[in-house]
Regions:
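ABC family nucleotide-binding domain
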Residues: 3-158
Length: 158
């Protein structure tokens, strides 16, 4: 049995005439975390968006946990629940508290009970040393604090 959870083979993606992803190959092993880094405009976000099917790739194959990503999106919620992302812009909802930002996806995507999601969020907020800010809103925090909240939010999707 393979320990590969994400397999990307010869993936290509264009926006019009501009090829943003060219022959991308990548294997991610189960329980490993990776960082996709590179200069602005190099396709990092596009690659991640293809992995969770927010964007469609035009050539190649992407397999997540044994499910090949095709036009058939019946398993997409399960796949999205397994792919966590943290972006340079934190995209926290300004009208929600930090705690609510962290619990939103586990409750709506994973159907986790609210109390369990709150306990999980507090665990991860403690991990990034910002649990004392849980009831504040993003606009009340510094950029670094917002970044740590975004990391905790991604961790909440386990």
């Amino acid at each position: 049995m393979s320990d590969t959870i994400i397999q990307i083979k010869d993936v290509n993606k264009w926006f019009g005439d501009f090829q943003v992803l060219k022959d991308i190959n990548l294997n991610v092993e189960k329980n490993k975390k990776i960082v996709v880094c590179g200069p602005s405009g190099s396709g990092k976000s596009t690659l991640i968006r293809c992995i969770n099917r927010l964007e469609e790739h035009q050539q190649g194959s992407i397999i997540v946990d044994g499910n090949e990503l095709t036009e058939d999106t019946k398993n997409i919620e399960q796949i999205r629940a397994e792919v966590g992302m943290v972006f340079q812009q934190f995209n926290l909802f300004p009208h929600l508290s930090i705690l609510d930002n962290c619990t939103l996806a586990p409750v709506w995507v994973k159907k986790m009970p609210k109390k369990d999601a709150e306990d999980l969020a507090m665990k991860h907020l403690e991990k990034v040393q910002i649990a004392d800010q849980a009831h504040k809103f993003p606009g009340q925090l510094s950029g670094g604090q917002q970044q740590r909240c975004a990391i905790a939010r991604a961790l909440c999707m386990e």
